[in-house]
Amino acid sequence: MSNAPTALTLAGWQQAYRDGQSPAELLHALRLKLRTDDSAWIALASEAQLDAQLDALASALQEAAGDLSKLPLYGVPFAIKDNIDAAGWPTTAACPEFAYGAETDASVVARLRAAGAILIGKTNLDQFATGLVGTRSPYGAVPNSFNLDYVSGGSSSGSASVVARGLVPFSLGTDTAGSGRVPAGFNNIVGLKPTKGWLPNTGLVPACRSIDCISVFALTVADALTVANIAGGYDAADAYSRKNPNSAKVGMPTKPRLAVPANPEFFGDSQNQTVYEAALGKLRELGAELVEIDFAPFRQLAEQLYYGPWVAERTVAVEGVDPAHINPVVRGIVENGHRYSACDAYKAEYIRAELSRRINDALTGFDALVVPTSPTIRTLAEMQAEPVLFNSQFGTYTNFTNLADLCALAVPAGLRADGLPAGITLIAPAWHDQALAAFGQRWQQALNLPLGATGKPLPVQITSDKPAQGCIRVAVVGAHLTGMPLNFQLSTRDAVLVEQTTSAAHYRLFALPGTVPPKPGLARVAEDGAEIIVELWDVPQARFGEFVAEIPPPLGIGNLELADGRWVKGFICEPYALDGARDITSFGGWRAFIAETRK
């Protein structure tokens, strides 16, 4: 990576900067590479906007005393869907007459910029985020990144497209009905649909305000999770923001128990069905137990989103907009909101509550539900002929998710016979985002598909039970985690991140007082233990002694048991240091605790 930006992942950009490249050089080259006639973009950063961000980045690095670990997204370009505010940029929601100049960043954008990320552009969408197709915009339809005759999926069409083509390593979308998942499936990328309220919606143009989610697109699950962990967290300015109770599992068993729909519907699309069935076979190869469940309550709840009073939320969101300026298909949808009464809304809420209870009961005893991301895909011409029917088909396996308060992770599953991608989605109850991502990383490595539409291979990630040759596998739990202050002690010694997983349920985590930077102590206990999030790193044997020599008391290296029964080297703590230390086990890991203390 010398003259033009070609890195596709966060690690690629970070490595470029470690190799001596400058953000100014790489990001100005990227800006010149991007085309204004690309329908995925609504606005691109001007030279002045980019320079202002680069100046702010230089100041942030100076404040960090040159420590890049304090800016985990240092110099990484990203894009946001143009219904999300960025200070100094217009927000259009794909409706020029609605547009306004944003005076402040949306909360998620502010957090990403504070971590060093650089906003390079705002992306196209189905107008007012109403649609799963990517064709309902006055800025043009966004075509599929694999075949220009097909839809890209929506409503976060542009955000998915620019990631799939490797223009940015990550982007933000939104997901109310599936807008952060369907485009991921259609473009061979990852779409992380977080638990409602994890990523705050402050600065988001609402679609259905009570169930809207800001989502993340990336080429890898690891990158999507990193971005979500930075952007997420409670925001008092958002009435729908929630604090993570830290009660959900953060890992998944080696042999998970997964629910799958009985008699899944593909609307005659045998190619999508073939990819899905092959994916189920691969899950079995990975040790998963698959159990069919009745999908009727999921389907019934999905129907409520567009064929019930929830459509009135969309009506409220655009009530100040002249109907003449709204896309005809979108206008037809939002005008339906006037058909429903307050009585209808309460009746629908009772139905939602009953079906949600049935859905969550059905998922009890399972680690996740696995569904096709979309049952089918359509051409642009087909979508023009049947815009509502085919949109409804795309939402078969997505529309129920937010109404039932579930989280989801869309991941690539393979290519169809015609060369188009298809995906699967992992779904679980609220706050199981980390567990889904843990298995999603394992799944992505097992399939080893090319990244998006770039044709480039997935970066090698060591996933075997044994460390790489000449390395010692070490579990880190605190300040050495990715993006934390002491992570450089691993990265500068050529250590390689293997995976995120959890300890066995025999440990408790404590915040050690007076440590700089703040550090936790992990202690094995005889009872009342819990699983704690850890990262596994393979450290070269030749550098292991140097690494251990930098570990101050009361910490040291010992043996640590993982949730799947493996034993690795890991951080331990002298018992004397735990006297009076705060027990933070309920947070599930050090990163969640640190995020809470910063609020």
Each predicted region: which residue ranges?
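An N-terminal boundary/leader segment
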Residues: M1-D55, E285-G287, G452-L458
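Short helix-loop capping/hinge segments that flank enzyme active sites or metal/cofactor-binding pockets
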Residues: A4, A11, P72-C95, P253-P261, ...
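Gly/Ser-rich, acidic/histidine-flanked active-site/gating loops
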Residues: P5, T9, G75, A87, ...
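Glycine-rich, small-residue loops and helix-cap segments
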Residues: L30, G75, A114, V168-P169, ...
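Short Gly/aromatic-enriched secondary-structure transition segments
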Residues: A43, A93-A94, L486-S503
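Acidic/His- and Gly-rich active-site-bordering loop/insert found
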Residues: L50-A52, E63-S137
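Short glycine/serine-rich loop segments
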Residues: D105-A231, N402-T425
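A short helix-breaking turn/cap at a secondary-structure junction
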Residues: K193-Y276, P297, A438-K466
